Amino acid sequence: MPTLNQLIRHGREEKRRTDRTRASDQCPQKQGVRPRVPTRTPKKPNSAPRKIAKVRLSNRHDIFAHIPGEGHNSQEHPMVLIRGGRVKDSPGVKSHRIRGVKDLLGIPNRRRGRSKYGAERPKSI
């Protein structure tokens, strides 16, 4: 604990805040190229392998992004769009890939939550 005299001479140093959106440059979405798609096991109580893509963004940052939904069509070096949003049970994964945009297809035959998975509207009978 500093004395009053020390505080008058030097003052207090403010804490530096860490930037949570450093990779995205404050943008809501960011474009990138995916070099590879590994699977990763989640934290303790959960066990299913999570589909995670390492993405090199247009500003040369490398991040890990979650691929939502069942199945995906990732080939070699496709263009993808990234949005924010962490995956609670996967450490270091702070963004999601947007389905149905660029080279990542939406989920076919999906009826509920279609906007989250890039699914087309079903034809009514």
From Swiss-Prot:
SUPFAM superfamilies, per database record: Nucleic acid-binding proteins
Keyword entries, A-Z: Mitochondrion, Ribonucleoprotein, Ribosomal protein
Region (Disordered): 1-50, 106-125
Cellular localisation: Mitochondrion
Biased amino acid composition, Basic and acidic residues: 10-23
Gene Ontology MF terms in the entry: structural constituent of ribosome
InterPro entries noted in UniProt: NA-bd_OB-fold (IPR012340), Ribosomal_uS12 (IPR006032), Ribosomal_uS12_bac (IPR005679)
Main location class: mitochondrion
Domain of life: Eukaryota
GO biological process, one term: translation
Protein name, per record: Small ribosomal subunit protein uS12m
UniProt gene name: RPS12
